[in-house]
């Protein structure tokens, strides 16, 4: 074993020890709040001279706090936002849990992972994070999906929307998103957004283009290593069809690039319809 290997092994051991210490603090049944435990973890990391990791955790804590302020500012203007006579937008509730996980299960890309309890807990927790501004979509009192912003700590907010499979192609996406964007504009003053869409998700592309989104390049999603991306593209060239070619022309890229990337859109929202359907 050379010096580099020894150094790597020591680094891994040190990191594992720090992570275990952090877990011990977070999982301790000592009656302390999550915020108190989080501050204790950051303090301990600083004592261990791991300033970079402490900085990242501190930034996460700040993002959570800022996100909580954004979420409070949004919902204090009204917790029910009417889309039409049957559909409303409201804050996420614990009773949405099963419906939300059903939507994740219907997503073929992560269907196998939804069987894992830890994964389900993780995605549900992310859905409820302070920095995420998620609005549940109800139709006549029944949960049918959600729309919202993934991370309000980012400079450019990314829009998300998912509906239960039985409720797709029912004309709900456009009015729900329009209503949400109107509310965000009137309540928070935010009008610039990003959208990322799978190259083969043609209905979503059509929906956001109808809302005014314009192509803004490509984004990496699962893979980031350039050689791995090229290898993946090479192995899947047979998947390129006429529709992929048309999308590639619209985004002015080689069709093969759509095999390893997602579409990036930019949306500047001027407002349509009612300013805010709050109740």
Residue spans for each PLM region:
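A short gly/proline-enriched turn/hairpin at secondary-structure junctions
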Residues: 88, 103-116
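Charged, low-complexity interaction regions
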Residues: 24-38, 50-53
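Active-site rim helix/loop that mediates acceptor-substrate recognition in acyltransferases
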Residues: 113-133
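Secondary-structure boundary motif
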Residues: 28, 47, 106, 125-129, ...
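Acyl-donor (CoA/ACP) binding surface of acyl/acetyltransferases
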Residues: 2-13, 17, 39, 43-44, ...
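Short amphipathic alpha-helical heptad-repeat segments
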Residues: 11-22, 30, 34
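Generic structural signal for secondary-structure transition and capping sites
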Residues: 50, 108-109, 132, 189
């Amino acid at each position: 074993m050379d010096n580099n290997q020894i150094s790597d092994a020591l680094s891994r051991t040190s990191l594992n020890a720090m992570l275990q210490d952090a877990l011990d603090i977070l999982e301790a049944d000592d009656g302390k709040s999550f915020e108190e435990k989080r501050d204790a973890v950051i303090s301990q990391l600083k004592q261990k001279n791991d300033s970079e990791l402490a900085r990242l955790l501190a930034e996460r804590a700040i993002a959570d706090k800022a996100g909580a302020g954004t979420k409070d500012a949004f919902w204090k203007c009204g917790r029910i936002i009417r889309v039409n006579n049957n559909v409303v937008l409201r804050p996420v509730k614990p009773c949405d849990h099963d419906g939300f996980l059903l939507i994740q299960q219907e997503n073929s890309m992560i269907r196998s992972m939804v069987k894992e309890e830890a994964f389900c807990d993780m995605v549900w927790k992310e859905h409820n994070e302070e920095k995420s501004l998620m609005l549940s979509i109800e139709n006549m009192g029944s949960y049918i999906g959600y729309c919202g912003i993934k991370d309000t700590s980012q400079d450019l907010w990314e829009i998300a929307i998912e509906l239960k499979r039985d409720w797709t192609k029912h004309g709900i996406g456009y009015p729900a998103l329009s209503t949400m964007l109107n509310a965000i504009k009137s309540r928070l003053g935010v009008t610039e957004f990003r959208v990322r869409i799978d190259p083969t998700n043609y209905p979503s592309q059509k929906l956001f283009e109808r809302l005014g989104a314009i192509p803004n390049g490509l984004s990496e999603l699962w893979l980031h290593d350039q050689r791995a991306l090229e290898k993946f593209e090479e192995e899947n060239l047979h998947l390129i069809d006429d529709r992929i070619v048309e999308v590639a022309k619209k985004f002015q890229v080689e069709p093969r690039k759509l095999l390893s990337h997602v579409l990036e859109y930019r949306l500047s929202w001027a407002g349509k319809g009612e300013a805010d359907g709050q109740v």
